[in-house]
């Protein structure tokens, strides 16, 4: 874990014995996962006035020894019988990125990709 002023970083560790999970209301509408020089960015709906599940979270990050998951959540919605709901995400994968550990490093590495 690294807690910056702007970003929270959770690292996947293949030696981890205890799973880790964090959830939050993310007003920026994106979350990212860096692996080597590859960067996965997930964009999603963000409305701080909407009601979200899991104590108001619109994004959750989970990791254990095998994986790291970046999950976005839809606002709570009441559907009529037979109704439908669509939750959209936009994914992008970038190669040749350099991500440091400080908030400034992250800003520099990701700002042109958002």
Report the location of each language-model feature:
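A contiguous, surface-exposed recognition patch within enzymatic or periplasmic domains that forms
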Residues: 1-86, 101-109
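Short, hydrophobic/aromatic-enriched beta-strand segments in well-ordered soluble domains
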Residues: 83-96
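Extended, compositionally biased alpha-helical segments that mediate assembly or anchoring
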Residues: 97-101, 112-114
């Amino acid at each position: 874990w690294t807690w910056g002023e702007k970003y929270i970083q959770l690292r996947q560790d293949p030696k981890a014995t205890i799973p880790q999970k964090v959830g939050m209301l993310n007003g920026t509408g994106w979350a990212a996962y860096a692996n080597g020089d590859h960067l996965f960015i997930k964009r999603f709906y963000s409305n701080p006035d909407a009601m979200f599940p899991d104590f108001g979270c619109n994004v959750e990050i989970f990791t254990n020894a095998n994986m790291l998951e970046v999950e976005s959540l839809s606002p709570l919605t009441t559907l009529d019988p037979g109704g439908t709901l669509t939750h959209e995400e936009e994914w992008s994968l970038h190669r040749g990125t350099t991500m440091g550990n400080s908030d400034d490093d992250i800003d520099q590495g990701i700002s042109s990709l958002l």
